[in-house]
Swiss-Prot record:
Its cofactor is Mg(2+); Mn(2+). Zn(2+) binds at C386, C389, C406, C411. Belongs to the NAD-dependent DNA ligase family. LigA subfamily. This is DNA ligase.
Amino acid sequence: MADKIQLMKDKIEILDRAAKAYYQENTEIMSNIEYDKLYDELLELEKETGVVLSNSPSIHVGYELLSNLPKERHEKPMLSLDKTKDVGTLKEWLGTQKGILSWKLDGLTIVLTYQDGHLVKAVTRGTGEEGEVITNNARVFRNLPVTIAYKGTLILRGEAIIRYSDFIKINNEIADVGVKYKNPRNLCSGSVRQLNNKVTSERNVYFFGFSLVKADNVELDNSRASQMNWLKNQGFDIVDFKEVTSSNIEETVQWFSQNIEANDFPSDGLVLTFEDIAYGESLGSTAKFPRDSIAFKWRDEIKETTLLNIEWSPSRTGLINPIAIFEPVELEGTTVSRASIHNISIMEGLELGIGDTIGVYKANMIIPQISENLTRSGMAPIPEECPVCKGKTEIKQENGVKTLYCVNNECLAKQIKSFTHFVGRDAMNMEGLSEATLEKLIAKGLIKELADLFHIEKYKNEILELEGLGEKSFNKLITSINKARKTTAVRLLYSLGIPNVGLSNAKLICRYFKYDWNKIENAEFSELIQIGGIGDIMAESFIRFFSDEKKKVIVQDVLNELELEEVQLSQSEQIFENLNFVITGSVEQFKNRDELKDVIEEKGGKVTGAVTSKTNYLINNDNMSNSSKNKKAKELNISIITEAQFLEWLNNGVRPE
């Protein structure tokens, strides 16, 4: 008995560390399948011994919150759901009742409160007893109504999620994410719990309602389906659901399973709830689970295979990720041959060695993972040098998680941002080269400097092996790269990523030197500060860049691949030279404000984002607007002109008074 209780304590300690890492620190020290296995083993021991320890995860819902967001206790505790992987259990649980079967979205659960038709509060699930107030962040969710027709007090629950497509895009673009966000759920958690909701708004968070908690004086016929449809009519997106009975639940589960891969949103199973609200509520709850709902987790398809290699993939943060390469197997209809191991702690826990027989599966039927190591031959060697720069590596340990890092600050993998910037839309415009793809190309040693990007066609076979790139995508990429060979001095200058030299300043510099690249790269400090809009700091940064011998070689290698367009520019065309403009409000004669900005810059002017004492004109079609820019312009006695006045100036030379 004592041995079994000690075993329970050991399992609880491991589960507690894993849950803390996942929910508080947005990292993983074990896979979901390992966690579930340990948890089920603990439940069996508790059942066998009749002992449940006070710190067991079987009776605890969450963890203490560790952020600076305001906290608030929930009016009703938010319990987790009991779960099963057996459809027969679902059928038995439902019995003769009708039910609602819906997606179990894998994001962050949120409680929303509306009063008088307005969103007044949004709180995360948190510990289940207490959550974090994220009202300002919820206001910038992509699809959340901040005003609704219903004027009573409304409380509903739902899931904030980030779609797979946005996850891939955002994870490639956001520098501070690095390897921290392993999946859409972790990215969503970090996005929803921001102190600055500008960050939240840029992350494309969506909300899907799944439960109505309170709606005063609304008659919904004691029906969950009616509740969901009523929420939909109020403007909320709700989780897809189907009404089921014990006779059709098996085929309905099958329908959901067949539609997983078509979904752009993360899901980790299904939720079955009694359609009869009163009946469900009459059942009450256990200390941890409500009795009116149950979760269904997909039974993972596990295939045995042989571990062939562990590939170490460096990232822009210096972190070097271990990736398992194994004999290809068919999983959920696709061929899989690699899976992320995430960190050294997981690698040690699995005792992975080359040649081991391992079990692999797709987490949530999407992401390849290692479930177990059947032979456990011992740890494969951890590299002492970075695979990209051959510099020294070191193992770091934080919150009980071991990770491998390259300590060389000059490592090419850490310069990923310069490559990302170089291929960007306003620079070389090489469509198809995402940050993730560039990171893989660098990690494999296929590109070592910017000019190498123009010759990646010779690595076709290696590139086609990268996830997400097929023959068609590769051909489009090569076409885009070849198209980029013919470019402008402005694009080239901007693409070099010189500190403090943005696109508009690159245009000013190129225009000043008549687009002559030889004059541009050999510009003197005294010349640069003569250009309106170029100050001492920017000029110093420019001179420092072109004085660096290594940078000169990089630029020359790029130039050897390019054909710079000649620009013929007459002085008479520069009608906006040395003038500063600000654009606000909607435009009517141009496609958008960017098109208007381009016209101004082509004619020698500069467009800024804020009204200051240096602003000459504010372009605004609504002169009576109460916008901050309008007010500021009037305070500073700056001319406010309409598009029509601007066009009269542009086309007929009539400058507004």
